[in-house]
């Protein structure tokens, strides 16, 4: 439904493309993201510039990235954390959920293992209720957590505001903010300090810039995250993070997660820093370079 509606559109008419796509079908942000990123890539290649220049220019030469620790036993978590720090990654994102006391124990064990220099971010993926979240926050309050990401369900704005106010903790929202309208609602409420932007859940770079602008207007930070994308998707995220002024901490750009990819990136991973480079557009090599057949029909 989307592609037939935008056939023939100029690659520079990105705002118009979004109007057409939204009129053609509701939601389906991932599909709209694919079209949006393709248009941005083509337009910046037509101009002969890297994508980040089309998004407002370079705000930083490189983007810090973090590493993830899933829900596992303390021994495994500590081993992973030490390994990440030894590689130079000083920002660790820990997933939590299920038994609250087990999560508290794991976070405290990792904090003790990596010392005070490494940053620890918590992500509950909306898995706690207010009582559980309160118990967890009290249990790790002295662990110097950088962000508590989406502790509560995305619809529970009142309890999120209460958690933020009652504990004074830095809250990062992910699942709750998929659209500019949701960003306004949460920014006005004072429920959070920052938003996570994932291109596939907001509809692409055009909407992502709108959300980031709302956050900036309210003095809030942004974390750009990829969702185990190929180099194409992660590259678009990297260019966005390079261009946004309100990136205040490491981003979740999971370039290291792709085992088999449809493209090869020209971006440079140097320790915990990811560099967008100056190639035109997103900055990935054509699939044809690897002998793959592309169906242009």
Stretches found by the model and what they are:
Residues 210, 269-270, 274-297:
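Structural signal for terminal/edge beta-strands and the immediately following C-terminal loop/tail
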Residues 3-11, 26, 86, 112-116, ...:
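Generic secondary-structure signature for well-ordered alpha-helical cores
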Residues 1-46:
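Metal- or metallocofactor-binding catalytic centers and their adjacent structured scaffolds
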Residues 12-14, 51-54, 147-154, 225-227, ...:
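Flexible, glycine/charged-enriched surface loops at secondary-structure junctions
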Residues 2, 35, 48, 92, ...:
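Conserved, mostly hydrophobic/aromatic
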Residues 144, 155-172, 177-277:
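Shared catalytic-loop signature of beta/alpha-barrel
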Residues 37-69:
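Glycine-rich, aromatic-flanked loop segments that form ligand/cofactor-binding clefts
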Residues 56-167:
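Metal-dependent enolase-superfamily TIM-barrel catalytic cores that perform enediolate-based chemistry
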């Amino acid at each position: 439904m989307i592609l037939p509606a935008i056939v023939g559109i100029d690659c520079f008419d990105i705002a118009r493309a979004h109007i057409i796509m939204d009129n053609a079908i509701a939601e389906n942000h991932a599909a709209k993201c694919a079209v949006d990123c393709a248009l941005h890539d083509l337009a910046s290649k037509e101009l002969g510039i890297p994508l980040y220049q089309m998004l407002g220019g370079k705000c930083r030469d490189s983007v810090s990235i973090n590493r993830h620790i899933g829900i596992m036993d303390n021994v495994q978590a500590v081993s992973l954390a030490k390994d990440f720090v030894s590689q130079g990654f000083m920002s660790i994102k820990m997933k939590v959920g299920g038994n609250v006391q087990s999560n508290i124990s794991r976070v405290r064990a990792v904090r003790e293992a990596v010392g005070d220099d490494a940053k620890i971010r918590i992500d509950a993926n909306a898995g706690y209720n207010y009582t559980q979240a309160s118990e967890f926050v009290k249990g790790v309050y002295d662990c110097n957590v950088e962000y508590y990401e989406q502790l509560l369900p995305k619809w529970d704005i009142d309890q999120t505001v209460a958690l933020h106010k009652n504990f004074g903790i830095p809250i990062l929202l992910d699942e709750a903010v998929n659209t500019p309208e949701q960003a306004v609602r949460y920014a006005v409420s004072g429920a959070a300090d920052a938003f996570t932007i994932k291109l596939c859940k907001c509809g692409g770079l055009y909407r992502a810039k709108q959300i980031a602008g709302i956050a900036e207007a309210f003095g809030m930070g942004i974390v750009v995250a990829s969702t185990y994308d190929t180099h194409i998707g992660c590259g678009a995220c990297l260019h966005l993070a390079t261009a946004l002024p309100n990136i205040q901490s490491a981003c979740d750009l999971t370039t290291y997660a792709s085992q088999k990819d449809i493209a090869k990136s020209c971006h440079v991973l140097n320790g915990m820093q990811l560099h967008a480079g100056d190639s035109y557009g997103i900055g990935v090599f054509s699939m044809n370079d690897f002998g793959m057949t592309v169906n242009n029909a």
